[in-house]
Each structure stands twice: as C-alpha cells, then as structure tokens.
C-alpha cells in the first residue's frame, strides 16, 4: 500500500531476501509456488520439469477434480513418460543413423527433421541432441567440399542457394502476367516448416518441397539481402524493409515487369493480391521472438501460434491464383554458451551486425588470425573464410544458452524452398 495515493502493489520475487528492508518492514510477505494454484497435479513433477508459461497456462485452464499421479502429470504437460516406446532412444538412434544423407534433398531434411520435431514437441530434444551433433558433423564435411560451388550453381531447375531464388523464379515464369509470390518467413528452420506443411495438408494443399542454402554467415543482413537482390550480397547494404522493397522492385524493373504489377509487404496483411503479378512478402514474427525462447519447446509453442497467424496470408495468395514460393533467409539452432567476447575481441570486429551469437566478422584478416591464436581450441569448431568465422557446432558467444543463428549448422543453413500451385 502506497500512502501517497492509496494504491496497493503486489511484488513477485524469486527470493524474499531480495526485498528491500524498508519495504519488508511494512509489507505482508508470503512464500508462493506455482504448484499452489495447480491443485491436482503432482508437485514433484512440476518442480522437476519447471515448465514454461505456455504449459502452465494449459494446466491451469484444464482444472482438475481429481489428483493426477506423476506419470499422468507428465502426460498432461506433454512430456513423454519413461515407458513410451516411441522414445526408445536406442531405436531412434538406429533409425536416424540409417537415413541416407543427401544434403541437397528435401527428403533427407524431412526424415531427419520429423524426428527432431517429435523430440522437441515432447521435450526430448536434449536426449536426442547427441544424434543431431553426429548428423551435423557429417554436414560439415559437405559444407567444406561443396558450399562455395552451390553459390554459382545453375538455377534453371531449382535454386541451390538464396541468391539464386529470384533468378529461378524469373526463368520459371517468363510471362509478366503470371501471378507469382515469394513468401519469406524470417528465421524458419526446416522442422518449423514441417509444422506449416502439416497445416497446409489440412487444407488439402501439398507443396512441392525442395531445399535451399542460406548465405554464410547465416544472418538477415546477408542472407535475406541475397534473396531479394537475386545476387551475391554487399557488405555496405543496410538491412531494413525500405531497402528490401527497393531491391524487389529494382529486380523486376530490370526484367521489364511493369511496376504497377509489383508489390512488397513487410509484416502487414496481404491486401488486394488480385492487382499484382509479383508479390514479395516477409514476416519476421518468428525471428523477432525466437531469441527470447529459453528452449526449443518454447519455440515450438511460439511457432504453433505464429503459423496460425501466417497461414491466412498464404491462403489469400493461394485463392488469388498465385504460384507461391515459401522459403526462409536462414534457420536457427539451440546453442550452448561458450563465453561472451571481451572488450578487446569486440574492438577487432565491424560494429554493425558483425558479432552475433554464432558469427564474427573481423575488420582485418590479421585480427581474425590473432583471435584464433589466442583461442586455438576454436579452430576446429568454426568455419573460417576470409575475414569471417562462424560456429560449426551448437555453441554461441553468450553467457547462457539461446536459440539463435549465424553459423553453419545444418539447421540454420538448409532452409525450405517449397512451391504451391493452385489445383
């Protein structure tokens, strides 16, 4: 209670010792656990799993009239119980390791990411992470031998990298009156695309799946610029919706597509699609909230909610008769903290977008060499080229774990390139 206004305040803190002495002297203090308002659930399981808000909200909304034991509480939370055969890790390991890995095939990504999606949705990803590391280790060999060549590979049958997406669309749709949309979901990993694909299937829509490679480092400034430039990105580019729109309009202007039939939308609604023949659309709703997710189950829940909002815009284009190409500028990966950069290390980097959780862009190659001289243990863990270095494995330059991007893990480098045509 505040004497000046008569208002009453309730403060929630992790520890009563955090309360200032003068406030504590006047306040009514009590210890409270979230389990106190979730009657009927096993308290031990609630404390054991420490579920996120989305799960707690689900439990609260499904109030019980009877008590659930530990196994029933886990099931209600969406956590897998120990005796469920679907999560026999030995069997899963055998199945995953038997997948023939073709890193240019959507079939490979679907098979691998179906296991990942199932694990994430049931909070089993930590138990499966060793398998993801194994697969990624094989992917790194592919990157070393093939990545640079993919950037200049012919786009006629399909784009192998994001800089070839627009050239492919242009070659596949030579008629200016063809209605074509590029639908970019910022930061969408392939397992998240499978969630979208399942939602489309409920509407009897079956995309033609392919994969495409993000630009490296897998950051928005470079990879999405390459998408909308239809060419290799420029370091001097300033990433914002205005410049992205400019790239989109300029690309089609050079191909003699009338400007009046071209449109670009950033995070808005699809409006009057029947007026245009080239529609560029970007939604950043996934990426904007991705970095705040404490684990992949949080990201799974976020994705479920965001895709419900995204799907109607896809349907507007579909109903307007567009051929829709759905892709992403990069994916994401759950990364483990290495450490934060110190002041000297930060001073060696470009100031704008040169250091993220998973990439470093140095002002000079000498600075890069010095960094690895001081941190020799990182040489094998990072892909180094020119003046940049990116994490190969699931680590980040942070003080705590986070979901992020910028490196060359297969979950952030391989993005969907899906085509939808109206039947």
How does the language model describe each region?
Residues 1-180, 187-324, 328-423:
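…; additionally, a secondary subgroup of soluble metalloenzymes is captured
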């Amino acid at each position: 209670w505040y004497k000046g206004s008569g208002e009453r305040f309730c403060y929630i803190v992790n520890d009563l010792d955090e309360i200032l002495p003068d406030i504590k002297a006047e306040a009514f203090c009590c210890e409270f656990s979230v389990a106190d308002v979730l009657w009927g659930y096993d308290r031990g399981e609630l404390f054991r799993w420490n579920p996120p808000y989305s799960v707690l909200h689900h439990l609260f909304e499904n109030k019980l009239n009877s008590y659930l034991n530990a196994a029933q509480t886990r099931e209600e939370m969406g956590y897998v119980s120990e005796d469920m055969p679907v999560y026999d890790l030995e069997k899963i390991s055998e199945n995953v390791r038997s997948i023939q890995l073709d890193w240019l095939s959507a079939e490979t990504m679907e098979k691998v990411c179906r296991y990942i999606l199932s694990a994430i949705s049931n909070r089993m990803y930590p138990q499966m992470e060793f398998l993801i590391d194994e697969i990624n280790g094989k992917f790194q060999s592919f990157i070393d031998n093939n990545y640079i060549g993919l950037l200049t590979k012919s786009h006629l049958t399909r784009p192998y990298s994001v800089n070839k997406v627009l050239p492919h669309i242009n070659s596949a749709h030579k008629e200016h009156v063809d209605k074509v949309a590029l639908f970019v979901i910022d930061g969408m990993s392939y397992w998240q695309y499978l969630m979208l694909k399942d939602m489309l299937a409920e509407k009897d829509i079956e995309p033609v799946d392919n994969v495409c490679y993000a630009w490296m480092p897998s950051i928005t400034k470079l990879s999405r610029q390459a998408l909308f430039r239809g060419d290799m990105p420029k370091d001097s580019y300033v990433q914002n919706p205005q410049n992205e729109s400019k790239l989109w309009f300029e690309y089609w202007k050079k191909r003699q597509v009338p400007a009046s039939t071209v449109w670009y939308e950033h995070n808005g609604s699809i409006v009057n699609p029947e007026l245009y023949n080239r529609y560029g659309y970007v939604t950043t709703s996934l990426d904007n909230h991705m970095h705040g997710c404490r684990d992949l189950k949080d990201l799974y829940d976020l994705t479920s909610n965001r895709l419900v909002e995204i799907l109607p815009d896809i349907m507007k284009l579909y109903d307007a008769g567009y051929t829709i190409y759905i892709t992403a500028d990069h994916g994401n990966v759950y990364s483990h903290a290495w450490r934060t950069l110190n002041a000297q290390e930060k001073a060696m980097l470009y100031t704008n977008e040169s250091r993220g959780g998973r990439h470093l862009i140095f002002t000079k190659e000498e600075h890069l060499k010095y960094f690895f001289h001081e941190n020799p243990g990182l040489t094998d863990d990072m892909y180094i080229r020119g003046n940049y270095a990116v994490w190969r494995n699931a680590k980040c330059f942070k003080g705590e774990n986070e979901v992020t991007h910028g490196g060359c893990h297969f979950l952030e480098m391989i993005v969907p390139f899906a085509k939808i045509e109206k039947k």
